[in-house]
Amino acid sequence: MIHEKYTEMRNEQEALLSRKNTKTSFYNGIYDRYEHPVLTREHIPLHWRYDLNKETNPFFQERLGINAVFNAGAIKLNDRYCLVARVEGNDRKSFFAVAESDKGTEGFRFRQYPVCLPALTDDETNVYDMRLTQHEDGWIYGVFCVEKSAGTADLSEAVASAGIARTKDLTNWERLPDLVTLRSPQQRNVTLLPEFVDGKYAFYTRPMDGFIETGSGGGIGFGLADDITHAVIDEERMTSIRRYHTITESKNGAGATPIKTERGWLNIAHGVRNTAAGLRYVIYCFVTDLSEPWKVIAEPGGYLIAPFKDERVGDVSNVVFTNGAIVDDNGDVYIYYASSDTRLHVAVSSIDKLLDYAFNTPADALRTAECVKQRCDLIKRNIELL
């Protein structure tokens, strides 16, 4: 017998799932923000959280709670917008779940079950932040962070690597061995390009000395692997690098799967700087050369997206993060970004707007005197027009 509370809660959830999502008044000429998040913990199906049987759950208590839904890979599949979200339980363990809609800004509903991804080893503790790539070899690849216990007395220590799985339908997944980078002890925030480069699988990487600190890792790397089923990268060339007193001073990493455009590979990434209140994550972009994807050919100064209003507050405040974007046939770009490790939003731009932003916004001049000069030059040109 189903508990009567289920019907009440199901009706409330249906109203949430069916609500319209409208643009806000926010304006910068680059992208539009939307009023509501596209995914939250309230979007999770009730039968994932509650035992619906009144006999075994007379008080209708939540048995397997959900803490947050955020950081989602994204792909257009069978004319539907599909998100592979990071879902975090009350027990802190993350798992992947597919939500889909026929619209890119609203109406996302989770499939009947989450993704059942097998572990490769017994010490694999957590998985999260999947990037999705529709590769020219015919497979959809998911590249994600795998967290393993370091097996030491310090419980805060862990080892991060890049896991790889592939699918044709986002339902049935084949787990492949983790990516091996011979010159980097740890990896996370890895993306796979959708095309072969010199006949090899091409990755943007993030070399790390430790689980949290990048150490000697200078920024976002680029490397090639001969075989995706046993992916090994020897050399990593640096692309977008960390710089002092910028949005990437502490660390940076790849975000959404790179987007191929006529002018280059459009990369939507994240940068991190330290503050008195902790790490601040923002989203920025850069463009790499089509034939030599390790060469940065445009990198505007500052951030593209930063925490705004209510986005500033959550489990890990003052953070925005992306690992998924979808490009429509008309050139519209849906950037799915999480705020404060709690919920998932969408910003909508276009290829033309993002390329204009990337190539025509001044690069970071790195010093206050030069940055003020950039601004004064803009002011002077505008005054001449007024």
From Swiss-Prot:
Q: What does the record give as the reaction this protein catalyses?
A: 4-O-beta-D-mannopyranosyl-D-glucopyranose + phosphate = alpha-D-mannose 1-phosphate + D-glucose
What name appears for this protein in its UniProt entry?
A: 4-O-beta-D-mannosyl-D-glucose phosphorylase
Q: Which GO terms describe its biological process?
A: carbohydrate metabolic process; cell wall organization
Q: By its UniProt entry, which PANTHER family does this protein fall under? A: 1,4-BETA-MANNOSYL-N-ACETYLGLUCOSAMINE PHOSPHORYLASE, GLYCOSIDASE
Q: How does activity depend on pH?
A: Optimum pH is 6.5.
SUPFAM superfamilies, per database record: Arabinanase/levansucrase/invertase
How does the record describe its quaternary structure? Homodimer in solution.
Q: Which EC numbers does the record give?
A: 2.4.1.281
What is the annotated signal peptide range for this record?
Answer: none
Instruction: Please report the organism this UniProt entry assigns to the protein.
Output: Ruminococcus albus (strain ATCC 27210 / DSM 20455 / JCM 14654 / NCDO 2250 / 7)
Give GO terms: molecular function aspect only.
hexosyltransferase activity
